[in-house]
Regions:
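N-terminal module-boundary/linker segments of secreted carbohydrate-active enzymes
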Residues: 1-15, 20, 146, 154-157, ...
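Aromatic-lined carbohydrate-binding/catalytic grooves of carbohydrate-active enzymes
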Residues: 4, 17-131
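Residues in flexible loops and secondary-structure boundaries
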Residues: 7, 44, 58, 164, ...
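Generic recognition of stable, solvent-exposed alpha-helical segments in well-folded globular domains
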Residues: 16, 59, 63, 134-137, ...
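A generic structural signal for short, solvent-exposed coil/turn residues
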Residues: 26-28, 148, 169
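Short secondary-structure boundary/capping segments
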Residues: 49-51, 92-94, 138-142, 170-175
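Glycan-recognition surfaces
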Residues: 104-107, 154-203
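Extracytoplasmic, non-cytosolic globular domains
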Residues: 118-121, 125-154, 158-162
């Protein structure tokens, strides 16, 4: 949802995206993931538990994943390896401040992957970059928290805007290799060309 909407998302919008994926034949073509990116964060309570944005997702996040699953699709969610999200930095979204995984790794993974039942997680790096954290060590900690949930079917995406290194293939199912894609052929072509030498690291 980030490429078009940034943090301006809602339960209704995500539901419509899921429906469009099915009715336009994309599900039959093999496209199965509906990913909720930055913008669903509301606040952490006194225990540190994350709550969904009350205006954008008034029914919480579990009904969203349930609806996506009811259409035979997979549900994806977002977080940041640091303490603040990309939306808090680039969109001035105050709800993203303190909403990252830093210091809440196990708590958030249990919530997102078990209680809310999401199947995919994109882990951004805007907040972690600001903190000067070491990439491989940071993602290792987060992936351990994911394993501790008992979920073995979760797809992990490392979002680092460049190929993170050969270590990524042992942790994640996918990873970013470039800056954000743009809705024009030159951007798509650029990313295809960057993949030429990176295909050896895929599985």
């Amino acid at each position: 949802s980030w490429n078009t909407y940034h943090v301006n998302i809602s339960e209704d919008l995500i539901r419509k995206q899921a429906e469009a994926l099915v009715t336009n034949g994309l599900k039959d073509a093999g496209y199965l993931y509906i990913n909720v990116d930055d913008g669903f964060f509301g606040h952490r309570d006194e225990t540190g538990k994350m709550h969904a944005h009350p205006g954008r997702f008034p029914n919480g996040m579990r009904p969203v994943s349930d609806y996506i699953h009811s259409l035979g699709l997979k549900a994806g969610i977002y977080s940041d390896a640091g303490d603040n999200t990309c939306g808090s930095i680039y969109d001035d979204d105050a709800n993203g401040v303190g909403s990252g995984l830093y210091g809440h790794e196990q708590q958030d993974m249990d919530l997102y992957l078990k209680e809310w039942n999401y199947d995919f997680i994109k882990i951004d790096y805007c907040g972690a970059k600001e903190l000067g954290l070491e990439e491989e060590k940071r993602y290792t900690t987060i992936c351990e928290a994911i394993r501790n949930t008992g979920r073995t079917d979760v797809s992990i995406n490392i979002c680092r805007w460049a190929f993170p290194g050969t270590w990524a293939k042992d942790m994640a199912r996918s990873w970013r290799i470039s800056s954000d894609i743009r809705p024009r052929w030159s951007s798509v072509k650029h990313i295809i060309e960057k993949n030429l030498y990176l295909s050896a690291y895929g599985r």
